[in-house]
A protein has these predicted regions:
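Iron-associated oxidoreductase/ferritin-like identity signal
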Residues: 1-172
Length: 172
């Protein structure tokens, strides 16, 4: 059985991951409305990955005899006017998620909950990758986004991204 505080934080993280999926689906909708199907594809896959993260956390709680407590998912803002605003909001959100994961990790460390720390290692590594990807998207957009041909090529590159389920889900 997990410590109550860890269980509460993990349940909250499930909700944050589901909100992330909801947010990225909103980004995908906006980008698709703008004719940027490649960018939309990239965020649609991000949404799928965030849902996977929620399921991985859910499975961990269940495996440790903790009741999963889902909460309301707030509607994400849809006020983004430019692609760069969306990309920047994506990076800011990933930084928020990283801080949340780090907080849970810190609590697990303080409680000497090594099992949870080991489990969270996956998420710590994942967040490094997520922040790098978000930064790379911003850099590529800045480099190519103002040129129609460059934007076309970048959009096509992003359209080729394919969803691969997390090994943490397929291993269960």
């Amino acid at each position: 059985m997990l410590n109550e505080k860890i269980a509460k934080l993990m349940n909250e993280q499930i909700n944050k991951e589901l909100y992330s999926a909801y947010l990225y689906l909103e980004f995908a909708n906006k980008l698709e409305d703008d004719g940027l199907n490649g960018f939309a594809n990239w965020y649609f896959i991000q949404a799928q990955e965030e849902k996977d993260h929620a399921l991985i956390l859910r499975n961990y709680l269940i495996d440790n005899s903790v009741k999963v407590a889902l909460d309301t998912i707030n509607k994400p803002t849809d006020s983004f006017k430019t692609v760069e605003e969306i990309l920047r909001a994506g990076l800011a959100h990933e930084e928020f998620i990283s801080a949340s994961i780090n907080n849970i990790y810190g609590e697990a460390f303080a409680l000497k909950d090594f099992k949870t720390m080991q489990f969270l290692d996956y998420f710590v590594k994942e967040q490094v990758e997520e922040e790098k990807n978000a930064n790379d998207m911003i850099s590529k957009y800045r480099l190519f986004g103002s040129d129609p041909k460059g934007l076309y090529m970048l959009n096509n590159e992003l359209a080729s991204r394919v969803y691969t389920p997390s090994s943490m889900l397929t291993a269960k």
